[in-house]
Amino acid sequence: MAELPIAPVDRLIRKAGAQRVSEQAAKLLAEHLEEKALEIARKAVDLAKHAGRKTVKAEDIKLAIRS
């Protein structure tokens, strides 16, 4: 189950042009977004560790997104 709130995901789908959004659709997208965010976060943590830091910086996130 996704930890991301469903309401903001619903708003994103509506912002993309949907007039109505089923709860199941919003939940499914929230789960996918969370999986992708965790993947990026893990890469960013690895990059910070490789740089000898405990703190994840914006540059780590940017690099993780690109890779």
UniProtKB/Swiss-Prot annotation:
Name this protein carries in UniProt: Archaeal histone B
Subcellular location, record wording: Cytoplasm; Chromosome
SUPFAM superfamilies: Histone-fold
Coarse class of the protein's main subcellular location: cytoplasm
InterPro entries associated with the record: Archaeal_histone_HMF, CBFA_NFYB_domain, Histone-fold, HmfB-like, TAF_TATA-bd_Histone-like_dom
Residue numbers spanned by region Interaction with DNA: 20-22, 54-57
Family: Belongs to the archaeal histone HMF family.
CDD domains given in the database record: HFD_archaea_histone-like (cd22909)
Superkingdom in the source lineage: Archaea
Species name: Pyrococcus sp. (strain GB-3a)
Primary role: Binds and compact DNA (95 to 150 base pairs) to form nucleosome-like structures that contain positive DNA supercoils. Increases the resistance of DNA to thermal denaturation (in vitro).
